[in-house]
From Swiss-Prot:
Protein name per its UniProtKB record: Vacuolar membrane protease
KW Ligase (keyword) present: no
Taxonomic lineage: Eukaryota, Fungi, Dikarya, Ascomycota, Pezizomycotina
Chain sites annotated for binding Zn(2+) 2: D218, E253, H351
Entry-linked InterPro entries: Fxna-like_M28_dom (IPR048024), M28_fam (IPR045175), Peptidase_M28 (IPR007484), PFF1_C (IPR053975), PFF1_TM (IPR053976)
Organism encoding this protein: Arthroderma otae (strain ATCC MYA-4605 / CBS 113480) (Microsporum canis)
Transmembrane intervals: 52-72, 400-420, 428-448, 478-498, 520-540, 551-571, 676-696, 719-739, 746-766
Keyword list, A-Z: Glycoprotein, Hydrolase, Membrane, Metal-binding, Metalloprotease, Protease, Transmembrane, Transmembrane helix, Vacuole, Zinc
Length: 976
């Protein structure tokens, strides 16, 4: 809703009144527009450039396009009442409820239960599919419970933080549905086996949740959608032509571990394309987040309700979105080509206890499932060569080379996909052709003596007499008011950032800011402004592969056409010479103190059928009632060449303002404007407004949904507010050339809306039960000293309000620090003792450190009770490490140029003992750090009392999530 509309319209009204005052003082000739002639002689014109048609039609067009965009964005298409062939929605919903009964992170006993349940469901679906088909022509189904694979790798290329080494043991489940055209041999049984023929398709969904969320959308819906894909593609009539691999991976939440482990499975050499289904919200529509190329994106376009824009991919590429999904591994490590489809809002429920089945719907399930079915069906049915062949990437799959693409949906029902090179080509063409076309039009107008724009005067060729054209009037009004209104809009963004920065968290649409500008020269200024933006966009398209500037191409195209129409209108005007002659004759017949009481000569009369629109008739100017100042010889006035100076003076003087010929709406415009086409404005408006509303409206809503709650994670709120302010101006910009024709009703209404929303935004509390502020929990214990600190990390000042409600902080010192937490503060206090291990602190971890004889290597042996996740942290980075029994992959380096500062150890076995050999750097004089184990299972009450206490006593507007992999961290310090 508008925040700055009232301010903008006020500035517009001031400018308009000042301009009108100037016109009256200078006695500018009034305009007589064709619509006035039509209105007075032929009746009402419903599309004339007059206040009511402009107000009504413009408002209807905006409402007609904006309302459906908002509805589509927020309402999920309903699921069918009867399940389509090959799927069972009731079964899917029941599976989701079962899957999300408990938190099930990798480091929890419930994760093992989910693993076993998935195996049973997969076997049951496979068995029922065989029984259902009743024939032997169905595809072969192979189920792999991967409890053998392990891998050592590092965080290089995953996050821009300190280098972290990882050892992980797989608990992945894979299902291979053999395609009709696949190799019929079980090639994976051979150690050196290689698939033959065309590559297959991978569908991936991770089945672990975070320790503080039930994982309904992250990633329960993805898991049960993948189960339904198994049912669908083993149903007669839907058998795949190319092989389909369904990967249920474990450990995604902790470091994309399951996807990395898949690299060691033989089937990773078979899949050339992929679909990753994920969740970063808690319901709504599933969004196409990313795609590797144009060719694979076209298969997503087959879905019934596509939803997404290339803006998301560019945000990942530019680093605005810092979180990662398994897409990163499949694309970056394997070189597969595919798609990333995920839920994205509301972020306030993401990774919290509200990510449950209660807060999603069967409609959301169907939206993701239907997209997965159509996309996968297209991929497994494709038999071309687009995804096969050498691509020049050594060490990666030979799956052909794709082209960068551009994509966006239209109202969630159709999908546009084309190559970035196509966008670049059109951008260059528009940059060249549009200015040349306008220049050619201007040259033609000058040649025909009809270029009224940019001209203040014209001079009669036969006498040198000067007549005012007022062609420069309003030239600088557009940039002036654009600058003022934009500054006010952005100023309000800074005001909100200062006074109530998190109001967008619960009220994202209360901060949207429309603007209004005047029409004079507006399209010409818009043309120049959009041309500059298109130049910048074209450079980024070519040099950085940024495709989300596609809206600028369409925007500029529409503005170019509208601007050209404005120039084409000038061809309907008389030449400036004819206009000047007529003005002098009319002026000579107008009473003034220095009028000559002479009649015009014959050669001074305008030609018959002149461009002025009708033959000249002296009676045309004798429509006023005689007064005491009326000349007695009014019809006999004439001007000689000697009197052109006085004629020129009077051309700026008193002119008849008979209301029947000069309605009040146009009385102050240039007289020559009577020949402009009154209804041309509607063409200009329709060329610009609809496409801008659709493209920028969808982009604006997408951007708002993706970012309005990132402030809880330490993201900059100012960037969001300024972004919304800029989008507001761009979306309302098509109204600027016409806004002066609006009646006062809409500006007045929006002024009141401005006042109301501004007061609300400055005073309302930004959080609520449905839009909770996320704060992150961790409990850190020094197992040697027994020091026990519970901590919450969140944005200030609200984190202090939350901490004060916790009973165990009463009368105790609470320490808060803000450095190193990305715009958030960490508040710590003496916490309640956890019961994750039924033993004294010193017995929670068993470890041994032995120094090698060369003084360059050290062996660590570490094990923790009731856990399968431990760490070794070093105060100074080490050069290298090796976990006994592990493998490495040259595609995935396990160390980096600056060494490793942390080693994370994950085992599928509880209370496992890891043996880690560490190589120190030459500079490692300070060989000290910590051995640590973590506990993440919070399904049993009273296991982590400090967390239970926070959940019980924190305000209803606060939500608890995890800070790191473990909810409880126990550590011993070491120094060598």
């Amino acid at each position: 809703m508008p925040l700055s509309t009232g301010l903008t319209l006020s500035s517009l009204n001031v400018m308009e009144k000042a301009d009108n005052h100037y016109n009256m003082m200078t006695k500018q000739p009034p305009a007589l527009s064709p619509v006035d002639m039509v209105s007075s002689r032929r009746g009402f014109n419903p599309i004339a450039f007059t206040p009511w048609p402009v107000t009504i039609l413009s408002s209807l067009v905006y409402l007609a396009f904006i309302i459906p965009i908002i509805v589509v964005h927020h309402l999920v298409p309903p699921a069918p009442k009867e399940s389509p062939e090959g799927v069972d929605l009731k079964e899917a919903w029941h599976d989701l409820q079962h899957l999300t009964r408990q938190y099930h992170p990798y480091n929890s006993h419930s994760n093992d239960e989910v693993h076993q349940w998935l195996l049973k469901r997969i076997h049951a679906i496979s068995a029922s599919s065989s029984a259902r088909s009743g024939d032997t022509t169905g595809p072969d189904i192979f189920i792999f419970d991967d409890n053998q694979t392990n891998l050592t790798f590092s965080s290089v290329g995953v996050a821009a933080k300190s280098i972290t080494g990882v050892y992980f043991e797989s608990k992945n489940i894979l299902v291979y549905i053999r395609g009709a055209e696949d190799d019929q041999e079980e090639w994976w049984e051979s150690p050196d086996g290689e698939p033959s023929g065309k590559g297959g398709v991978l569908v991936n969904a991770h089945y672990d949740s975070v320790s503080t969320g039930y994982g309904a959308t992250d990633n329960g819906v993805g898991v049960i959608s993948t189960l339904q894909l198994l049912k669908y593609f083993t149903t007669p009539g839907h058998y795949p032509r190319k092989g389909l691999v369904l990967l249920f991976n474990d450990g995604e939440e902790d470091f994309l571990n399951g996807a990395y482990a898949f690299s060691q499975h033989p089937l990773s050499k078979f899949t050339h394309t992929f679909l990753n289904i994920e969740g970063a919200g808690a319901g709504g529509r599933a969004v196409l987040f990313r795609s590797t190329d144009t060719e694979v994106t076209r298969f997503y376009g087959n879905t019934e309700h596509p939803f997404g824009t290339v803006l998301a991919r560019d945000a990942f590429q530019l680093g605005f979105i810092r979180s990662e999904t398994d897409y990163h591994v499949f694309d970056g490590v394997f070189g597969m080509r595919g798609l990333d489809v995920a839920f994205m809002e509301p972020r306030s429920r993401y990774h919290t206890d509200q990510d449950d089945a209660r807060h999603t719907s069967i409609d959301s399930v169907w939206h993701m499932l239907s997209a997965a079915i159509k996309t996968t069906e297209g991929l497994v049915s494709y038999t071309g060569d687009a995804f096969d062949g050498d691509n020049g990437n050594d060490g990666k799959l030979n799956n052909g080379a794709g082209t960068l693409g551009v994509w966006f949906d239209f109202y969630g029902s159709s999908f546009a996909v084309f190559e970035l090179n196509t966008l670049f080509g059109h951008s260059v063409a528009l940059l060249v052709v549009a200015p040349l076309l306008l220049i050619a039009t201007c040259v033609t107008l000058y040649t025909l003596d009809k270029m009224y724009m940019f001209s203040m005067y014209t001079y009669l060729s036969e006498s040198g007499g000067q007549v005012s054209l007022y062609g420069l009037r309003g030239l600088f009004r557009f940039p002036l008011i654009l600058g003022i209104s934009t500054a006010l809009t952005i100023g309000l963004a800074f005001l909100l950032m200062k006074a109530n920065p998190f109001i967008i968290y619960s009220s994202p649409y209360a901060v949207w800011n429309p603007s209004a500008l005047h029409r004079a020269y507006a399209f010409t200024w818009m043309f120049g402004m959009m041309w500059v933006l298109l130049v910048i966009a074209t450079v980024y398209q070519k040099q950085h592969g940024i495709a989300s500037s596609y809206f600028i191409v369409f925007y500029f195209a529409g503005v170019s056409i509208a601007t050209w129409i404005s120039y084409l209108e000038l061809f309907g005007l008389p030449t400036t010479q004819d206009y000047a002659r007529r003005q002098i004759r009319i002026t000579d017949r107008t009473p003034s103190s220095d009028s000559r009481l002479l009649a015009p000569s014959a050669d001074e009369l305008p030609p018959s059928g002149s461009a002025a629109g009708h033959d000249f008739n002296p009676e045309d100017v004798e429509d006023e009632e005689p007064t005491e100042s009326t000349s007695l010889l009014r019809g006999q006035q004439r001007t000689t060449f000697a009197n052109y100076a006085s004629a020129r003076s009077n051309s700026d003087g008193n002119i008849s303002t008979n209301a029947s010929l000069h309605p009040k709406d146009h009385r102050l415009e240039q007289r020559w404007s009577i020949n402009l086409i009154s209804s041309a404005w509607i063409l200009q408006f329709l060329f610009v407004a609809p496409i801008v509303i659709i493209l920028l409206g969808q982009l604006g809503l997408f951007l708002t949904s993706a970012t309005y709650q990132i402030g809880a994670d330490g993201g900059s709120q100012l960037v969001i507010y300024v972004g919304i302010a800029v989008l507001s101006v761009l979306i309302l910009l098509p109204l600027f050339p016409f806004i002066h024709r609006f009646t006062y009703h809409i500006p007045t209404f929006l002024l009141f809306v401005l006042i109301g929303t501004l007061v609300y935004n400055l005073t309302a509390f930004p959080f609520s039960h449905s839009n909770r502020l996320k704060v992150a929990f961790v409990q850190e214990i020094d197992l040697e000293t027994g020091k026990n600190q519970a901590s919450l990390v969140g944005v200030e000042p609200y984190i202090h309000d939350i901490v004060r409600t916790i009973p165990s902080t009463t009368g105790k010192e609470v320490s808060c620090i803000s450095r190193g937490y990305g715009g958030r503060a960490k508040c710590s206090w003496d916490g309640l003792k956890p019961r994750v291990v039924d033993a004294p602190y010193k017995e929670w971890i068993t470890y041994n450190i032995s120094q090698a004889k060369d003084d360059k290597h050290t062996r660590f042996e570490i094990s923790g009770k009731n856990t399968r996740a431990c760490k070794i942290l070093f105060d100074s980075p080490i050069a290298d490490f090796k976990v006994l029994g592990s493998v490495t992959d040259e595609r995935i380096p396990h160390t980096g140029p600056k060494g490793v500062s942390e080693i994370r150890l994950w085992s599928r076995t509880w209370e496992n003992t890891w043996t880690v050999d560490v190589e120190w750097t030459k500079k490692n004089a300070n060989r000290q750090g910590k051995v640590m184990c973590i506990w993440s299972d919070d399904n049993d009450l009273k296991v982590i009392p400090a967390l239970d206490e926070i959940r019980n006593f924190a305000p209803a507007w606060a939500a608890i999530t995890k800070l790191r992999d473990g909810l409880v961290e126990g550590s011993h310090s070491f120094k060598l």
